[in-house]
């Protein structure tokens, strides 16, 4: 019960943080919707633990591991767990609270909830499903893969049409939670079939994306807070021209957008690239249903990644480029150095992971080995810092070479433009 007690305590603290500005009726509404969904999730988890404890009623994790159960009862518990953690993480269709709470909460609170508290749900899923349920059946993976793919697509489709900046980020969280669940579902499928190396690849991709999303989403919320503090505007349609008035914020926000759009050489690309490598291994699965489901999830994942990149191009272009479209945007001023420093610190880590991902992959590998029974080859001693999660012949990535190519291409384009069309 310690797990559920801490789970409920986190829900209450999150509710209180959303109510920081409790004078607004929409904030109170968002907070109570969140509390309602959190209570539903706790009920689902309580029922799941009741099934796992069996007739003995032993709720210690060690006792649950030793309790014998058939795969169908464990599968029912899995369904309850997915609904329980999904209501906390923001999986579709349990996401209704998320686009309400993130815009209602102060930006630093939204950064904390998106970067940390929603990730506790991922921990809960891993702890229960991979640790307590026992050896998995292959069909257990169908639910997380399906809900993950639906969440990724629904999240990005709603994000791309939003007018309010923090709502864009909220729906972007739904998309990324979906990506994480696709990876965890694949890890379950591979583990159930005794494919330790592909399971380690998918699981590593999931954990790395958990970290990456926490970093770049927190920096984006800090950036959104800087924009709102400088202009008082929440709608991106009333912004524009901020790159001239807030140049430091503009550069940092651009880097964060590149990271969440999964473009190299930032960290978001690495975890999504690893997941694509895992999807490419699914034809080796023996079950025809999984061989059909995994490519469909891969197509949805690729589509959501492309739409996500378009979404953040739209957000950045409307907010920072062009001319100001309101008086408040015309009089915007750069935020203080402490706010900029918070964004900069997170983005330095994002860039470091993107350039040298092998260090983080090697740090995750022992966890993957203990959970799925396999690990990726050691990466950070690879030649020229190239990562090759399977074999160098099959696939490899070098963040430094990509960064060098981007830098040379950018400087060359800049030189050509100014050479051919010099300023008068």
For each feature predicted by the language model, list its residue ranges.
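Intrinsically disordered regions, especially transient/low-confidence alpha-helical propensity segments
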Residues: 2-4, 12, 69, 94, ...
């Amino acid at each position: 019960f310690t797990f559920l007690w801490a789970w409920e305590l986190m829900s209450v603290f999150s509710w209180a943080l959303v109510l920081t500005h409790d004078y607004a009726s929409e904030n109170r509404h968002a907070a109570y919707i969140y509390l309602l969904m959190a209570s539903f999730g706790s009920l689902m988890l309580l029922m799941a633990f009741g099934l796992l404890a069996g007739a003995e009623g032993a709720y210690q994790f060690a006792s649950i591991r030793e309790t014998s159960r058939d795969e169908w009862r464990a599968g029912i518990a899995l369904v309850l767990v997915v609904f329980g953690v999904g209501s906390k993480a923001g999986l579709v269709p349990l996401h209704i609270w998320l686009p309400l709470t993130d815009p209602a909460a102060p930006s630093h609170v939204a950064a904390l909830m998106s970067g940390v508290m929603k990730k506790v749900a991922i921990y809960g899923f891993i702890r229960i499903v991979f640790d307590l349920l026992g050896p998995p059946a292959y069909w257990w993976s169908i639910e997380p893969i399906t809900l993950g793919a639906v969440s990724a697509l629904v999240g990005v489709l709603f994000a791309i049409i939003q007018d309010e900046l923090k709502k864009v980020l909220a729906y972007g969280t739904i998309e990324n939670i979906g990506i994480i669940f696709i990876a965890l579902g694949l890890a379950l499928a591979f583990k159930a079939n005794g494919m330790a190396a592909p399971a380690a690849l998918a699981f590593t991709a999931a954990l790395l994306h958990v970290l990456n999303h926490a970093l770049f989403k927190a920096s984006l919320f800090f950036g959104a807070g800087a924009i709102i503090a400088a202009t008082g505007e929440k709608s991106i349609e009333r912004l524009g021209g901020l790159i001239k008035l807030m140049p430091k914020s503009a550069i940092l926000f651009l880097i964060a957008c590149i990271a969440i759009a999964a473009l190299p050489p930032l960290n978001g690309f690495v975890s999504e690239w690893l997941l694509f490598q895992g999807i490419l291994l699914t034809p080796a699965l023996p079950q025809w249903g999984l061989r059909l489901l995994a490519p469909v999830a891969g197509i949805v994942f690729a589509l959501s990644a492309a739409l996500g990149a378009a979404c953040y191009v739209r957000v950045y272009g409307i907010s920072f480029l062009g001319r100001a479209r309101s008086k408040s945007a015309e009089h915007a001023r750069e935020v203080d150095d402490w706010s900029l420093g918070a964004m900069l610190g997170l983005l330095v880590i994002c860039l470091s992971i993107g350039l040298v991902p092998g260090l983080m992959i090697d740090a995750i590998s022992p966890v993957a080995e203990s959970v799925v029974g396999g690990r990726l080859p050691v990466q950070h001693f690879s030649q020229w810092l190239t990562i090759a999660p399977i074999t160098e012949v099959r696939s490899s990535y070098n963040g430094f070479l990509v960064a060098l190519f981007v830098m040379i291409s950018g400087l060359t384009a800049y030189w050509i433009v100014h050479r051919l069309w010099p300023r008068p």
